[in-house]
Amino acid sequence: MNLNFLDFEQPIAELEAKIEELRHVGHDAEVNISEEIQRLQEKSHVLTEKIFANLTAWQIAQLARHPNRPYALDYIDGLFEEFEELHGDRTYADDPAIVGGVARFDGRPVMVIGHQKGRDTREKVRRNFGMPRPEGYRKALRLMRMAERFQLPIFTFIDTPGAYPGVGAEERGQSEAIARNLAAMARLRTPIICTVTGEGGSGGALAIGVGDRLLMLGYSVYSVISPEGCASILWKSAERASDAAEAMGITAHRLHELGLNDRVVEEPLGGAHRNPEAMMESLRAELREQLQALEGQSTETLLADRYQRMMAFGQFRE
């Protein structure tokens, strides 16, 4: 399996390459080298723990963008049953960068919505690299209204570089579509649980990110601008993206310290892409707990608490 090791993971990559080489040799040789393979595997595990215990904000941002990372459809397949995708905004078109539909979670009917990136080149282009156009956000709002009508809890999965800034998208009202979603989600009379699974890129993420709970995976990020974009503005050079990532405080744990997310769901060692099954189990348990807590509240309490959450953001304290 191609794990697509990042630059800071190269020492791990070298060890894994040696392990793979020994496995091939072991099939052909009469000598038993299983002990050597086990020793290298243990060494790789210790090295991985050491590297991942000291990640910078920029390295975490790179992990959030990892091409092997599970996307919305992977989480839908792993966490929900009987998913039926719904298409179109009933105004202009369908947008494959946003996927959504009805499903069951622990047997309970729910609505699921998320950003979807592509794996190969053709799929990336079709999904517009996970950058929704206005019709994507309007489709999401249509599904949320449907969920409210039928009293279905809403789960959203956020993973986008941002809303698509193309001319056509702007002509069709990109900012209006995002703003309308923010206003509508603040008042929807059904529980909403949002999870940042990778990149939480500015308004493009917020447009499906207003809810009663905001969860973030351990190696996800959330920011008003990309580190490269911030560095280009402040220092006129995208090469200072690492400095920008640190200064903006974009990581899940830093945002939790600031009270901007409700829970950090820890990822398996090496990231969600290294062990998707373990990631699904951890996230399923967290989503189940949060949904049970929210369904125990009255609609009036739900809306009042959601309003207070929104009003608490951005407060300055000495």
From Swiss-Prot:
It catalyses: N(6)-carboxybiotinyl-L-lysyl-[protein] + acetyl-CoA = N(6)-biotinyl-L-lysyl-[protein] + malonyl-CoA. One of its GO terms (biological process) is malonyl-CoA biosynthetic process. Its EC number is 2.1.3.15. GO terms for molecular function: acetyl-CoA carboxylase activity; ATP binding; carboxyl- or carbamoyltransferase activity. Keywords: ATP-binding, Cytoplasm, Fatty acid biosynthesis, Fatty acid metabolism, Lipid biosynthesis, Lipid metabolism, Nucleotide-binding, Transferase. InterPro entries: Acetyl_CoA_COase_a_su, ClpP/crotonase-like_dom_sf, COA_CT_C. Pathway: Lipid metabolism; malonyl-CoA biosynthesis; malonyl-CoA from acetyl-CoA: step 1/1. Acetyl-CoA carboxylase is a heterohexamer composed of biotin carboxyl carrier protein (AccB), biotin carboxylase (AccC) and two subunits each of ACCase subunit alpha (AccA) and ACCase subunit beta (AccD). This is Acetyl-coenzyme A carboxylase carboxyl transferase subunit alpha. The lineage of its organism: Bacteria, Pseudomonadati, Pseudomonadota, Gammaproteobacteria, Chromatiales. The gene is accA.
